[in-house]
Amino acid sequence: MQKLLIILILFCILKFNVDVEGRTATMCDLPECQERCKRQNKKGKCVIEPEMNIVYHLCKCY
């Protein structure tokens, strides 16, 4: 029972560290982005847009 409690506490600590340090909401896959924009006869580019404490990696077609 104690081992299970220790594992649960460690999991919560690690989860908290990831939430604090890595606040990335979405990831942009450049090849997929370029392919999607190519269908619209545009060029695709991954851009970073910060909003409050979260960073968004979005696909933009130009």
UniProtKB/Swiss-Prot annotation:
Function of the protein: May block potassium channels.
Main subcellular localisation: secreted
Organism of provenance: Hottentotta judaicus
Gene Ontology annotations for the cellular component aspect, listed alphabetically: extracellular region
Protein name, per record: U10-hottentoxin-Hj3a
Family in the record: Belongs to the short scorpion toxin superfamily. Potassium channel inhibitor family. Alpha-KTx 23 subfamily.
Signal sequence range: 1-22
Residues at the site labelled Aromatic residue of the functional dyad: 62
UniProt entry keywords in alphabetical sequence: Disulfide bond, Ion channel impairing toxin, Neurotoxin, Potassium channel impairing toxin, Secreted, Signal, Toxin
One Gene Ontology term of the molecular function aspect: toxin activity
Disulfide bonds: 28-46, 33-59, 37-61
Domain notes: Has the structural arrangement of an alpha-helix connected to antiparallel beta-sheets by disulfide bonds (CS-alpha/beta).
KW Transmembrane (keyword) present: no
Tissue: Expressed by the venom gland.
Transmembrane parts of this sequence: none
Cell compartments where the protein resides: Secreted
Chain positions of site Basic residue of the functional dyad: 45
